[in-house]
Regions:
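Short, well-ordered alpha-helical microsegments
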Residues: 16-19, 82, 176-177, 231-236
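Conserved beta-alpha
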Residues: 136-218
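Proline-aspartate-enriched helix->loop->beta-strand connector
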Residues: 3-6, 215-229
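A transmembrane-helix-recognition feature enriched in membrane-embedded lipid enzymes
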Residues: 63-71, 130-137, 263-306
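N-terminal nucleotide/polyanion-binding subdomain common to many enzyme families
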Residues: 63-150
Length: 306
């Protein structure tokens, strides 16, 4: 069994007498107590709860993270991620997962609001190979890449057995139609509870409320969000605790699964060159993005001694 050696308590959740009582009990068990001024909902959404002598405490060690440009990238692999999804799905309803790459990390580094959104997610997964590579160089040997398209495939593959229901939000009606066909062919028994292609413009408050009601009425377990970064992360954060499912932003995964875009060969994925393959597919849209963010990331890692 796992031994708790250190508990961290949100400052505003306990009064002084309760803190002293918890500290005294914890010390009897050889456990260190820290008090930090953070929001309790942030802690509860990212951590696993435990008890010491019947008292509620918080253990922040459930998910190890590596700070990359101010973004807390989870140290994980696909197996660990899938295990967490299965064990925490009910607790994480209404929350969201970000799938981070160099572009989103550099954007978050320069945009405090977007950085908060990334760090407020239950997980910011290392979709980009350079992120997991950086984590390993920082001593996190277990850090592996977990891409949005691969995660969606893995979840869909076990969904019939688990009874999980899926909603797809984003992309075009044509892509969603292809996506439904491919998912039903490849993953027999998977329940697609619904799909929605939102307008490119910003929805009115009334339209947005109606969309949320339609999503929740289908009772999904997962809402896959394919709006592209940073739009999809902003959408998920704005709908936290409104959409009653776990939201996962997966970018181009809809297009990959539908067959609109081919993924890079495995050798390119393994050598962190998937960005180059995508650049060759769509140079007009991606050239300036990759030039800007990749150079900034390389400069940052160089200054960090990596």
């Amino acid at each position: 069994s796992t031994r708790i050696t250190h508990i961290v308590i949100a400052e505003e959740t306990q009064n002084r007498s309760e803190l002293l009582q918890i500290t005294a009990i914890a010390e009897n068990y050889g456990i260190k107590v820290s008090v930090i001024p953070v929001y309790s909902d942030f802690l509860s959404s990212r951590t696993m709860d435990n008890t010491v002598n019947g008292l509620y405490v918080i253990d922040l060690k459930m998910q190890e993270t590596c700070d990359i440009m101010g973004v807390n990238i989870v140290v994980t692999d696909m197996d660990k991620t899938m295990t967490l999804l299965e064990s925490q799905l009910e607790q994480w309803r209404g929350k969201y997962i970000c799938v981070a790459n160099v572009h989103t990390t550099v954007t978050a580094h320069e945009d405090a609001e977007y950085r908060y959104i990334q760090n407020h997610a239950v997980m910011a997964l290392p979709d980009g190979g350079p992120l997991s590579q950086f984590s390993r160089r920082q001593g996190y040997a277990a850090a592996q890449r977990v891409t949005g398209p691969d995660l969606m495939k893995q979840v869909l593959a076990v969904s019939a057995e688990k009874g999980w229901r899926h909603y797809f939000y984003g992309s075009t009606p044509e892509t969603l139609q292809l996506l439904r066909k491919k998912v039903e062919e490849r993953y027999p028994g998977v329940v697609i509870s619904g799909m929605m292609s939102p307008p490119f413009r910003e929805m009115t408050p009334q339209e947005d409320a109606q969309a949320v009601a339609e999503i929740n009425a289908t009772k999904p377990d997962f809402v896959w969000v394919g709006l592209g970064a940073p739009k999809q992360e902003r959408w998920m954060a704005a709908h936290e605790d409104r959409v009653q499912a776990l939201m996962i932003g997966v970018g181009a995964a809809f297009d990959y699964e539908a067959g609109n875009i081919k993924r890079a060969p495995m050798w390119m994925q393994k050598h962190n060159l998937e960005w180059l393959y995508r650049l060759m597919q769509d140079p007009k849209r991606l050239f300036h993005r990759y030039l800007k963010t990749n150079v900034k990331y390389l400069l940052w890692t160089w200054r960090s001694g990596e």
